[in-house]
Regions:
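Nucleotide/phosphate-binding catalytic cleft detector across ATP-hydrolyzing
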Residues: 1-169, 188-202, 216, 224-321
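Active-site-proximal alpha-helical scaffolds that flank and shape metal-associated catalytic sites
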Residues: 172-176
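A structural feature that tracks compact, well-ordered secondary-structure segments
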Residues: 180-182
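A cytosolic small-molecule/anion-sensing beta-strand core signal
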Residues: 185
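Long, charge-rich alpha-helical interaction segments
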Residues: 207-215
């Protein structure tokens, strides 16, 4: 029985699905795509610290406990590829097993760097441990979502019942930095429309929240700290929680209007012959209560649709061997 690590290394969070070639999923979890740089002290031993490329880091939620100036936001591709091995390492340590196969993805907007990204996670060293993986596969982000939609529709882990398999729809995967848009005709992904757009993801909401906090509280926070405010609905400063839910609601509404306008302006011809628009990714959670009958979103597991698809792809690779 082979072990499959499906890992969606996003700019906002790292989503993980881990399972076996018998179709059993063992782990499903996520952690924030952020690191904090720290120094070393021979008298202080902290097991949370990881050594990577001659520097010491805290990763994910451990990093978010540190001051903003210690954080490195993963908002640019150069940081994503640099720290990708560290995120893979963190996932492996949380799982407690070494996978036989790794399946991950990149936005269509960045697929020109796919070889370099694949090589980065094929072989690396963290905490004096060497990792080498022979079976590493890289898919476009939207492709992962599409595989999941085909199998589960809107209701993972329940097998889909409502789609005929011959639907025409526009799929939109909303990430932290990028959005990936793809066209499905008669149940199959079409090369006619498969596009990734940078700097149009949930990061735009985080930027607005960061700007509000700077203006209102005179505090500079990182985009990942702003994402935490977005997720929780409040800003915590020196032990006091400030309710920002109404501010966040307004920012979300503006973003969603801009997003739908972007899709309409760029892909109106494809929309004309589509039955609906399927939104996935973390950003789709903001539209799950939409009254628009033409918009569909997952009932749950919004952020995991790419990672689930990556796992399903990994299953097919072992079945073919």
């Amino acid at each position: 029985m082979k072990k499959i690590l499906a890992i969606d290394i996003g700019y906002g969070s790292v989503k993980v699905i881990y399972g076996y070639s018998d179709n059993t999923i063992k782990n499903q979890f996520k952690f924030t795509s952020v690191v904090a740089v720290t120094g070393k002290d021979e008298y202080i031993k902290d097991k949370r610290i990881v050594e990577y490329k001659d520097k010491s880091y805290y990763v994910g939620e451990d990093a978010l406990q540190f001051p903003s100036d210690a954080l490195i936001d993963i908002t640019e591709f150069k940081n994503l590829i640099y720290f990708a091995p560290l995120f893979v390492y963190t996932a492996i340590k949380k799982i407690g097993e070494i996978p036989d196969t790794i399946v991950c993805g990149l936005s269509k907007a960045q697929l020109q760097y796919s070889l370099a990204f694949k090589e980065a996670i094929q072989s690396f060293r963290v905490n004096d441990e060497e990792f080498n993986f022979e079976n590493v596969y890289l898919l476009p982000q939207g492709a992962g979502s599409n595989i999941t939609i085909d199998s589960y529709g809107v209701d993972f882990p329940n097998k889909q019942q409502e789609f005929t398999g011959l639907s025409n729809y526009v799929g939109v995967d909303i990430g932290f930095n990028t959005i990936d848009i793809f066209l499905v005709t008669n149940g199959k992904t079409s090369p006619y429309l498969f596009k990734g757009i940078e700097n149009e993801g949930v990061m735009k909401i985080a930027q607005k929240i960061s700007e509000f906090i700077k203006k209102e509280y005179n505090k500079d926070i990182s985009l990942h700290e702003a994402k935490e405010v977005l997720d929780n609905g409040f800003f915590k400063l020196r032990g006091t929680k400030y309710d920002l839910s109404s501010i966040i609601k307004g920012i979300k509404e503006v973003y969603l209007k801009e997003l739908l306008n972007l899709i309409e302006e760029n892909f109106n011809n494809a929309l004309d012959k589509s039955d609906y628009v399927f939104l996935s990714g973390g950003g789709s959670a903001f539209l799950n209560d939409s009254e628009d009958k033409k918009i569909r979103t997952p009932k749950s597991n919004f952020e995991y649709y790419n990672a689930i698809g990556f796992y399903l792809y990994g299953l097919t690779k072992w079945r073919l061997k």
